[in-house]
């Protein structure tokens, strides 16, 4: 199954709306740990998801969040 890195970006003013968007959206990403920089003023969130397509990967996010998110296909890589 392909893996995608979802990178979401928002402003400080949008931060609350981004997290609130998940309350009314059934997503397997809810209540799961991920990496975010909001606490430090960066206002970016990253998720790694397994999905058949980029569209399927973005479909795991509420529309409001997905519209501000890029999906990049990735794979584990060992750095020599």
Each predicted region: which residue ranges?
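Conserved, structured core segments of small domains
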Residues: 1-80
């Amino acid at each position: 199954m392909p893996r995608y890195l979802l990178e979401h970006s928002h402003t400080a003013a949008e931060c609350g709306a981004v997290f609130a968007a998940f309350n009314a959206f059934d997503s397997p990403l809810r209540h799961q740990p991920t990496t975010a920089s909001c606490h430090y003023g960066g206002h970016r969130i990253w998720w790694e998801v397994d999905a058949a397509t980029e569209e399927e990967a973005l479909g795991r996010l509420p529309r409001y969040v997905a519209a501000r998110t890029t999906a990049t296909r990735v794979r584990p890589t060992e750095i020599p």
